[in-house]
């Protein structure tokens, strides 16, 4: 059996420690600003803080771009030439052309050497699937068995983020000016739900942001009996007021602290959601009705 290489795109938002521990290879998406002629690589040539600084400097939000077909071919080739098999997952096909581009690129190599799994998710919703891949790889499963097993988890991933401001969604064309105004005036904090290969607004929470964080914790506790607690992610973007610690402290009363992974959202998630975005992500045992 060939050695299996697990590859994720940068939107999986895995921490450097997890990338090293699980031996994950990461290929970056692109980030561009309309006023600049620079093609940044997510997490390589631009960080989330640098992105936010540029938003203030330029007065515009960036655009994220998929990994193109040739980039995938160039990235896959050394591993295939070394006799390895590859399994790749990244941001869902309903949110980016990255998965489709990876699929096209995989056809340039011998059949059966590369498996592409559509996460139908983003951020550490994808990251949860990456960790599953790594664990199955370490059990000695081949690339096809890993892909078959991980696809069973795709509809079970629970990905929800509470956002503090609609400014980034508005500038990115994902909400109208009236909704943005109402959010500002009435302190509305939408919960973004990633489901069925897309993003939608679930609940809209009213009041202080801390209250919205409490609602996320309550949902976590409610889901506990139906949750795979081996890996739970708390993923945030520029939360400077301790919301991340608040959530981790609360979750650690119910599950071992070592099962909670605190990571920071990369530039692609920051592009659409903005600062003070935070989510609790986990895999359910059975799908929500």
For each feature predicted by the language model, list its residue ranges:
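Polar/charged alpha-helical tracts
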Residues: 20-21, 53, 70, 74, ...
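Class I S-adenosyl-L-methionine
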Residues: 38-88, 93-111
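Mixed-charge interfacial surface used for oligomerization/domain docking
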Residues: 11-19, 25-32, 37-38, 84, ...
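Extreme N-terminus of proteins, especially the signal/transit-peptide cleavage junction
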Residues: 1-3
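Short beta->alpha junction loops
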Residues: 66, 118-120
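N-terminal glycine-rich anion-binding loop in soluble enzyme alpha/beta folds
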Residues: 5-65
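Short catalytic-loop micro-motif centered on adjacent basic/acidic residues
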Residues: 6-7, 63, 88, 116, ...
């Amino acid at each position: 059996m060939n050695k299996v290489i697990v590859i994720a795109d940068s939107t999986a938002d895995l921490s450097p420690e997890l990338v090293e521990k699980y031996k994950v290879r990461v290929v970056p998406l692109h980030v561009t600003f309309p006023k600049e002629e620079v093609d940044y690589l997510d997490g390589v040539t631009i960080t989330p803080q640098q992105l936010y600084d540029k938003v203030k400097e330029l007065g515009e939000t960036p655009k994220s771009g998929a990994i193109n077909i040739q980039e995938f071919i160039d990235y896959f080739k050394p591993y295939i030439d070394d006799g390895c098999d590859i399994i790749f997952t990244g941001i869902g096909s309903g949110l980016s052309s990255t998965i489709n581009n990876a699929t096209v690129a995989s056809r340039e190599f011998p059949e059966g050497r590369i498996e592409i799994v559509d996460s139908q998710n983003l951020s550490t919703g994808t990251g949860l699937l990456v960790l599953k891949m790594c664990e199955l790889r370490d059990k000695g499963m081949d690339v096809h068995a890993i892909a078959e097993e991980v696809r069973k988890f795709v509809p079970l991933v629970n990905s929800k983020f509470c956002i503090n401001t609609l400014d980034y969604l508005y500038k990115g064309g994902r909400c109208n000016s009236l909704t943005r105004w109402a959010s500002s005036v009435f302190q509305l904090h939408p919960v973004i739900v990633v489901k069925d290969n897309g993003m939608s607004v679930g609940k809209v929470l009213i009041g202080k942001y801390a209250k919205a964080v409490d609602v996320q914790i309550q949902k976590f506790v409610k889901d506990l009996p139906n949750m795979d607690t081996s890996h739970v992610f708390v993923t945030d973007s520029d939360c400077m007021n301790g919301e991340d610690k608040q959530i981790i402290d609360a979750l650690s009363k119910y599950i071992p602290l070592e099962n909670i992974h605190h990571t920071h959202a990369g530039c692609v998630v920051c592009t659409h959601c903005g600062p003070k975005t935070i989510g609790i992500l986990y895999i359910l045992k059975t799908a929500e009705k």
